[in-house]
A protein has these predicted regions:
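Noncatalytic, solvent-exposed loop/strand surfaces
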Residues: 1-301
Length: 301
């Protein structure tokens, strides 16, 4: 894991690994988490969700944590939010049986660490655990339209904080509102203020509009996968530079939510289509719109 929490390369891994072998330390967390821990120098940052022991109380906390990298000691623990609805007034129970509101991974620029949670809470702390700013994306831009709990991780790149919200355009399970738009959000990591918000259009339908992927920076562009297509955007404005796809011809499949993020290497962008569909290797350097036979011409395999 690295500062973005979405990828990493590391050597000197243990040859054998188990509960009592190849382990330097263990740490009990205050609650469950599906987020990737990130490492910055001597610190490890991760998020967690706690639940009340009283089932009738239905209350819980969204937790931000900082651990010592070498000992596993908890250096600080902060209550980042309470409840799961915008404003912190919701119940702490999961909306479904396979969700965790501590699924997005934190990010850090070495000066502050920023935590995002599935209810829309976005909170920045100093490396010492002092709160610097907070906002709630649902409260600012409308309720999320996802069947499961939203779990995309934010991205820090060149002093900008990016978050994709690729969602349905209609309510699902009483969540969200009609005509909701998918969008990309760019913020100042120093204060959380919006620098730009750009609609990200798609012809996908229903679940296929949803994506839990992370924005990936590459060669001066932002790569975004979801809504049946892969797109490249200008980091300064959010404007779409090119569009490739689709892995869902005619957008016939309505239940192809995308979960993995794109990856780049060797002059190719790899994007994984949903539900046993192929992995596409697309040549970098695209411009304009590539679909149908034209889109396949840019596919290496």
């Amino acid at each position: 894991p690295n500062y973005n929490g979405s990828q990493g390369q590391e050597g000197a891994l243990p040859e054998k690994f188990g509960p009592d072998e190849g382990v330097r330390w263990k740490c009990s967390l205050p609650g469950s988490s599906a987020a990737t821990p990130i490492i910055d120098s001597s610190r490890v940052f991760l998020s967690s969700v706690t639940m009340s022991s009283d089932a009738d109380e239905k209350q819980g906390d969204l937790v931000a944590l900082c651990l010592d990298r070498f000992t596993g000691k908890i250096l600080w623990q902060r209550k980042a939010g309470s409840g799961y609805l915008p404003g912190g007034d919701g119940f702490s129970h999961q909306l479904d049986s396979k969700s965790n509101y501590a699924s997005p991974s934190p990010v850090t620029d070495g000066e502050r660490v920023i935590f995002f949670f599935g209810n829309g809470d976005l909170v920045a702390y100093s490396l010492k655990g002092e709160e610097e700013w907070r906002r709630n994306v649902q409260r600012d831009f409308g309720d999320f339209c996802f069947q499961w709990t939203f779990s995309s991780s934010p991205t820090l790149h060149r002093n900008r904080l990016y978050l994709p919200v690729l969602q349905r355009d209609e309510p699902v399970h009483a969540r969200g509102k009609p005509n909701a738009e998918s969008f990309l959000l760019c913020m100042d990591p120093k204060n959380g203020k919006t620098l730009w918000k750009k609609t990200r259009a798609s012809s996908a339908r229903k679940e296929s509009l949803e994506s839990f992927g992370t924005i990936i920076p590459h060669e001066g562009q932002l790569l975004v996968a979801g809504g049946d297509v892969l797109t490249g955007h200008d980091p300064k404005t959010g404007n779409e530079l090119w569009r490739w796809g689709t892995w869902n011809p005619g957008h016939k499949q309505e239940w192809w939510r995308l979960v993995p993020s794109p990856v780049v290497g060797g002059g190719r962008m790899l994007v994984c289509a949903p539900k046993k569909a192929p992995v596409y290797a697309i040549e970098t350097g695209l411009s304009g719109t590539h679909s149908g036979e034209d889109g396949l011409a840019s596919v290496s395999y």
